[in-house]
């Protein structure tokens, strides 16, 4: 069947404005490769690194997760050298810890590490919670269905 050239022009006349209207949306979708998932994910992160850059990185990782999973529940369990993140005298990310705990994130200090290093609750940032054992806390969270990750070296 033969179609008239003007009918093709009419189709283009209609389709081109629609295509141009969609271009910004398509470009934005392509640039934003983050997948937003509103499910309530639960993540427990082991942090045992005393490096100051690692302290900042672990707090940045929270932001990375929350950009994709805004309803995620996150707990950072600090042990060994990672306890420095929660110490008032050594933390390089105390502002970030305060900001994230205000948004519901949990920063837990291992009591066994505290005893071994002669650290008291008063030595910690006010936002820190103390758990009896980092390993027990991590295992308990995993048994409750939390995903486990390790940050730092």
Regions found by a protein language model. Give the residues of each.
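Bacterial Sec-dependent N-terminal signal peptides
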Residues: 1-31
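Secreted/extracellular ectodomain signature
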Residues: 30-153
């Amino acid at each position: 069947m033969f179609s008239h050239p003007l009918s093709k022009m009419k189709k283009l006349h209609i389709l081109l404005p629609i295509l141009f209207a969609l271009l910004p949306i398509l470009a934005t979708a392509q640039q934003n490769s983050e997948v937003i998932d509103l499910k309530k994910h639960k993540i427990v992160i082991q942090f045992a690194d005393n490096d100051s850059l690692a302290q900042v990185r672990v707090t940045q990782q929270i932001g990375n997760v929350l950009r994709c999973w805004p309803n995620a529940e996150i707990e950072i369990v600090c042990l060994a050298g990672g306890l420095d993140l929660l110490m008032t005298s050594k933390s390089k990310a105390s502002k970030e810890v305060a900001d994230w705990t205000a948004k519901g994130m949990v920063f837990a200090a291992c009591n066994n590490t505290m005893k071994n290093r002669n650290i008291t609750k008063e030595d910690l940032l006010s936002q820190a919670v103390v758990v009896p054992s980092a390993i027990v806390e991590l295992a308990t969270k995993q048994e409750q269905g939390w995903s486990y990750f390790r940050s730092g070296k």
